């Protein structure tokens, strides 16, 4: 407790107990890499099944970064980077022995692409330019893999229940698996995330003076923003939705629509309606 941030919040004893309990859980889940795993750093385990998860780790580190003086939690992501394939693919779930849980072309094999966000949040707090230089090519290669392997012919993105981390949401058409199938849909949250991440990687590139390496990301971000604005917004209900293969929109409102808050795809009137 002498090293970790100690909030001052008079009259909120229960909340403070929860805060310190969260740190106890975190510290209790620090793991050393198994011999031969290919992992390069001790890491913060997801505390689920012994595997590390791309989605979970990115969110956990948003909290754990405040404990950097105690332990280099951010290096948890280095184990994903170390397991990147030559074509840029990174599996979303990796076993403690370093084995991917899914084959790359499985619809549930990867995503959501949130690691660049986690890295930029860390950079904005600590200014670690050396780390930014190291992770930039890894993150750009992964983005390019998604663009090559997770898009329809019009450039929009697809995913799956496990690929989005929201497998309990009723969004795919009847007959498709809500967990394993892409449903021949344009997946709203995945497209918003890729738009958000493209701009973050461009920002990262400007800091590193390497933006020329990915300047095509700017064109993709504009394309995604226009498509989402023109095709995934429903004026009647004032909300954003997934799109089916026949061009109609899903009727299920999902929290994934609020990734739009990290983008500029909606105007003020639309945002006010959706919120």
Give the predicted meaning of each segment.
Residues 231, 236, 246-249, 260, ...:
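Long, K/E/R/D-enriched contiguous segments that form extended
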Residues 46, 92-114, 147-219, 246-259:
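The feature captures the catalytic groove of carbohydrate-active enzymes
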Residues 3-28, 67, 80, 85-89, ...:
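Active-site acid/base region of carbohydrate-active enzymes
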Residues 154, 263-265, 275:
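Internal glycine-rich alpha/beta core junctions
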Residues 200, 207, 224-227, 265-268:
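Long, repeat-rich segments with strong aromatic
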Residues 107, 227-228:
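Amphipathic, soluble alpha/beta structural segments
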